[in-house]
Design a protein with these regions (language model features):
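Structural/interface elements that position substrates and couple domains in central-metabolism enzymes
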Residues: 1-404
């Protein structure tokens, strides 16, 4: 079975590699020549534990090759970004462009799958696009939607062991897609239709966003009330039917921080809680920036000089290199406005360089700083001792037992 993956990013590349490692002949397509060249050397351009070793293995076996154009295959998977516009409207132009790129290669009996997170009805729209361009394929190819649901940092395991939701435009398409995924997925494959499968992914991430918003709102309340929010949540979770999540500096990434807008854009009146959760989580990042700026002003008043400030973490969540929609990056940018860049030590242990921020080793930054703002709870930070001689702003629970 020949399979063509369009998009070799944080999801497309691991999925292509895992599929290849399970005996599927894979062509991976990406418009970035550097990405293609890197993969063909058995290397990867992202950070994901264990993935580079697996990539090297499948490249060495000849079951995975990367290129910039599609190849004739039996299965085509669309795994490209679906961002939103400035007014939070979903942008499916990448999905459409990827679909157009494979239309010339499609033949009767082929399977076309979208994995990209998409607004409800996207798969049907792409089916109509295919039929318009290639009318002879109507009722002669299989079309389905199957959203990814993996955790960065544990992608290889979850690609294989997580359940998957698979929805075809008809029953035959669903069965065809189930047969494909059964070749490398050990989790249960749940059958449905395309619209339900599309909504399922949006629902999963919107649910997480709402729950995180509750925790973040609690952190704001506790700050004003003089309560340790970490202790509060630990105690509240002793109730057998309560499971409050942990607050942080906001919500980022290309899933939880984005997917709720796909619902609120199409169903604005019906999604009040979802919309408000987005506002709360966005506000939390603004609040963290304000708190840090207040600490800087207070230090200047008391000490008569500008402090050295360490901003700990830029990624959107712990222990990854992904900065997409990162609240930490927003906070760092906002806090540094109007100040001398030399007074700030920016830390992100999962990347070697950044085009905007000059990076500093986390131990050096912690030692030199007067004010330390923990924006992301990277595991490296757990080894740092509490220092009474520093102003510590712990927005993500690095020192959960301290009342900070």
């Amino acid at each position: 079975m020949k399979t063509c993956f369009i998009g070799l990013g944080y999801i497309g590349l691991p999925t292509a590699i895992v599929a290849a490692d399970n005996g599927i002949e894979v062509t991976g397509v990406d418009i970035n020549p550097h990405v293609v060249e890197t993969i063909n050397r058995g290397k990867i351009h992202i950070v994901e534990p264990g993935l580079e070793e697996l990539c090297s293995r499948v490249i060495g076996k000849g079951v995975l090759k990367a290129q910039t154009n599609p190849a004739e295959s039996d299965v085509y998977l669309i795994v490209v970004p679906t961002p939103f516009t400035g007014n939070h409207q979903p942008d499916i132009s990448y999905v459409e462009a990827a679909t157009r790129s494979v239309i010339p290669y499609l033949k009767a009996g082929d399977l076309y799958i979208i994995e990209s997170t998409s607004p409800v009805g996207t798969t049907e729209k792409m089916a109509q696009l295919i039929y318009t361009e290639r009318p002879e394929l109507k009722d002669n190819i299989y079309i389905a939607y199957c959203p990814e649901r993996v955790l960065p940092g544990n992608v290889i395991y979850e690609l294989v062991h997580n359940d998957r939701v698979i929805g075809g435009i008809d029953e035959a398409s669903t069965e065809k897609a189930v047969d494909f995924y059964s070749r490398f997925v050990k989790g249960t494959l749940h059958k449905t239709n395309t619209r339900t499968a599309e909504m399922c992914k949006l629902t999963e991430n919107s649910s997480r966003d709402v729950q995180i918003a509750f925790a973040n709102e609690l952190s704001l309340i506790c700050d004003k009330a003089g309560i340790n929010v970490w202790e509060l949540i630990t105690l509240a979770n002793k109730h057998p039917r309560v499971n409050i999540l942990q607050p942080g500096s906001g919500v980022g990434g290309h899933c939880i921080a984005v997917d709720p807008y796909f619902i609120t854009a199409d169903f604005p009146l019906e999604s009040q809680i979802i919309g408000k959760a987005r506002e709360i989580n966005n506000y939390k990042a603004f609040w963290c920036a304000e708190k840090t700026q207040q600490a800087i002003r207070q230090f200047e008043l008391e000490q008569g000089c500008e402090p050295v400030v360490a901003l700990m973490g830029l990624a959107f969540k712990p222990n990854i290199d992904d900065l997409r929609e990162s609240p930490a990056k927003y906070i760092a940018t906002k806090v540094m406005q109007g100040h001398n860049d030399a007074d700030f030590l920016i830390v992100e242990p999962n990347i070697s360089e950044h085009k905007v921020f000059k990076l500093t080793d986390y131990r050096e930054a912690y030692e030199k700083a007067d004010i330390v703002a923990f924006l992301v709870a990277h595991e490296e930070f757990n080894e740092l001792p509490w220092r009474d001689d520093k102003v510590i702003l712990d927005f993500c629970g690095v020192f959960k037992k301290k009342n900070v």
